[in-house]
Amino acid sequence: MSHTPSLPRRLVVLLGSAALIFAACGTAAPSGSTAVSQPPTTSVAPSVAPTDAEPYEGMAYPEADAPCGTAPYTGSLKKITATDRLTVEFQLCAPDPAFLPKVAFSVFGIWDSDYLAAHAPDKSYLTAPVGTGPYTVSQWDAGNRLVYTANPTYWGEPALTPNVEFRWSDEAAQRLLELQSGTVDGIDNPGADDIAAITGNAELKFNIREPLNTFYLGFNNTIKPWSNEKIRKAIAMGIDRERIVTNFYPEGSEVADYFTPCNVPFGCEGDATWGFDLDAAKALLAEGMAEEGITSISTELQFRAAVRGYLPDPPQIATEIAGQLSTNLGIETTLDLQESGAFLDANAAGTLDGIFLLGWGADYPDPTNFLDYHFGAGSGAKFGEPFPDVAAALQTGATSLDEATRQAAYVEANNLIKEHVPAVIVAHGASGTAFKADVTGSHASPLSNETFSVMQAGDRDTLVWMQNAEPLSLYCGDETDGESLRACEQVNEALYAYEIGGTEAIPGLATECVASDDASTWTCTLRDGVTFSDGADFDANDVVVSYAAMWDAEHPLHVGRSGAFEYWPGLWGGFLNPPPPAS
């Protein structure tokens, strides 16, 4: 059953001679080498000042409540309502102890609803975003650089450096060379062997990043032989994780005993994952192969070159793992290096058929961000079919406000994750950023969401930042890649934000969000006088439309880059009008 709202007046957008009417609002990098600039605003219905506006027509989505607990809907959101111009009400299917850090996440950034209606259908918003943030995009020269200019109408503190330029290289040595030569002002993820050179150079500064991440080896449990739990468990016992961390990770990194880092509340409840036990691994592998009627395993080790805090040297670590699988377990592998965007899309679609190297960096410090996204009911096809017992335990943890109940739920969930082995948990990697010493305000965020507007690049008018890869798009409602999220965060803002360089959720486009006594409803009061970079006024309908475009899989603005919108079901439990399961 579809849930479609009545149409508010301001979402009728004229494009040429045709009137396109949208109910409410619902990433590939640009393919050419031509610079992409901010689109003209003439195609967007002009906004009017609040004092001159017609009576405000707040909208609700969906018009009737979402069918909480009724298949096929598995989501946790019941309804979003613009009760007036500056108030939005979120009705939930069950309490959500992580509501505030969720709505602070940049994936849930707010867009001008008229702009979405005009530019989502043709996907032009992927490369030319509008937002309320401290910067606007002035140019995207595909394959080379992404340029930002300070937003002259920004409601908050103006950017200290007028321009920011993003560049990228997947080679740590190249990033360091650019920093040392002075062609860039800051870099992400210096190589483990380069940190000493940075800290020993008075002209540079290293900022350490807390290891709120996890590196893992994943399997699709619907594909043989990974459908056999004994084989998955044998690989978990047959990998020497200590050797990997010691040889390839920077100081401060840890062997991971749990999928969620221990500095996240409730992260390390229950039993630690399997340790290195070669004899037990060989015995289990033999049993599993006998059950499958096979005598050997040959597969691909699938990965991308993108450096991350959880994976500091992908080719070297992949080579090490391939060697261990061969030497320890007799599993022969072929290294399969894939393009980053295609790799992530294949992971989301559940089409990676080998052992894949991936990881996760925290978006907010709660187990729901790590566990629900990967193993919950709305986690999708990344690891094949979700395990119902794991999903049930996670549902309890995600919907209880009682700490003892949450703790017990995560004990159960972690024990079941250990037993089922959807992935081999390997490492929590330390990482950091490095800047020229004269860049004031430089920092490394534990969430990898560095805020460039608070940095002053000496006496220069442009701060040049070099990260690991090019963004996939600048509409992050349909992205999961950290390089894309960081790029979006300079332009788009969410209802809440995170403190600079930290993890605490603080007011953003909302001055406050307050829960009802039973925590079934959150009421958010919006900041008045905020405008988007296209000149449109920010109001409550923009919030409803921005969320609806992600929430409803049948929404006309549910477009994005790949169309996967992975974060929504991973963090909110499921889509409204979900697509049928893949055959």
Question: What are these model-predicted stretches?
Answer:
Residues 433-463:
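Long beta-strand-rich cores associated with HINT superfamily self-processing modules
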Residues 105, 123, 151-197, 527, ...:
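Ligand-site clamp/hinge motif
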Residues 44-57, 83, 89-91, 175-178, ...:
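Aromatic- and charge-enriched surface segment that lines or borders ligand/interaction sites
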Residues 49, 63-81, 245-246, 327, ...:
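Extracytoplasmic/peripheral linker and loop segments enriched in polar/acidic and small residues
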Residues 286-362, 465-468:
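Ligand/substrate-recognition segments at binding pockets and active sites
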Residues 128-132, 466-517:
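N-terminal lobe/hinge region of extracytoplasmic solute-binding protein
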Residues 48-113, 525, 556-583:
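Surface-exposed binding/hinge segments that line
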Residues 254-288, 305-316, 452:
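Structural transition elements
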